[in-house]
Swiss-Prot record:
Belongs to the LysR transcriptional regulatory family. Disulfide bonds: none annotated. The gene is nac. GO terms for biological process: negative regulation of DNA-templated transcription; nitrate assimilation; positive regulation of DNA-templated transcription; regulation of DNA-templated transcription initiation. Residues 1-58 form the HTH lysR-type domain. This is Nitrogen assimilation regulatory protein nac. Residues 18-37 bind DNA. Transcriptional activator for the hut, put and ure operons and repressor for the gdh and gltB operons in response to nitrogen limitation. Negative regulator of its own expression. One of its GO terms (molecular function) is DNA-binding transcription factor activity. PANTHER family: NITROGEN ASSIMILATION REGULATORY PROTEIN NAC (PTHR30293:SF0), TRANSCRIPTIONAL REGULATORY PROTEIN NAC-RELATED (PTHR30293). Keywords: Activator, DNA-binding, Nitrate assimilation, Repressor, Transcription, Transcription regulation. InterPro entries: LysR_subst-bd, Tscrpt_reg_HTH_LysR, WH-like_DNA-bd_sf, WH_DNA-bd_sf.
Amino acid sequence: MNFRRLKYFVKIVDIGSLTQAAEVLHIAQPALSQQVATLEGELNQQLLIRTKRGVTPTDAGKILYTHARAILRQCEQAQLAVHNVGQALSGQVSIGFAPGTAASSITMPLLQAVRAEFPEIVIYLHENSGAVLNEKLINHQLDMAVIYEHSPVAGVSSQALLKEDLFLVGTQDCPGQSVDVNAIAQMNLFLPSDYSAIRLRVDEAFSLRRLTAKVIGEIESIATLTAAIASGMGVAVLPESAARSLCGAVNGWMSRITTPSMSLSLSLNLPARANLSPQAQAVKELLMSVISSPVMEKRQWQLVS
């Protein structure tokens, strides 16, 4: 297979349009279509479905896309590794964070550490759900991702980082330093969607006690959740680091959830079938160092060894 055709194919899938991909690649659309046709002929498979709204990959196209991204990324890493011989590490390292994670406590110390140790490395931070971040890892669109516990995913390796207790956050009628699930069942709740780790843990606790949560809104965005809590319409369940950040933003209260106590494990996820680039490996080591630093250890979370 021709390297350039793989590059064209990946760009088409990323953009979802032959016309727009041709413009970005500075190639005539008929010529780009011919490159795709040649690739399909080499593989004896249809790779793209063409519709009025654009193009989407077939099942065979999805498989090729995953492998093509890995090939292109490895080539980029090889070029960079050769270029960096005898030079300071440089390039981009992409890190994903799931909403509500300890990102607010980790990212700034990490950025400062990278800036001090490897000033030529540029960090790209991306926030999305754990499921989306894992998919981006598999497709080699991210170097690593920090997410809350998730079911094992083929093509992704996980390394346990720490545990955080869950807290209730609000602005009206503080229940005290701690609150049990029976009391929470009487409150209006803002929760993330039902596939998130936080939601699964809350639903499990309510189900064991045959209680029904009064969910008045499902919110993924921390910014939107902050506005919702500030309005006084309801309360939210968050890990401690996110709870402290939101509580400070809305001048609210936070209560530790007891009976039962609830916690979530945070993990560092990596592509299972690809080696990290030298710069990504360096950033990973800094990330682990930041999490285990004395400043972080003072926070109310449990490091996982």
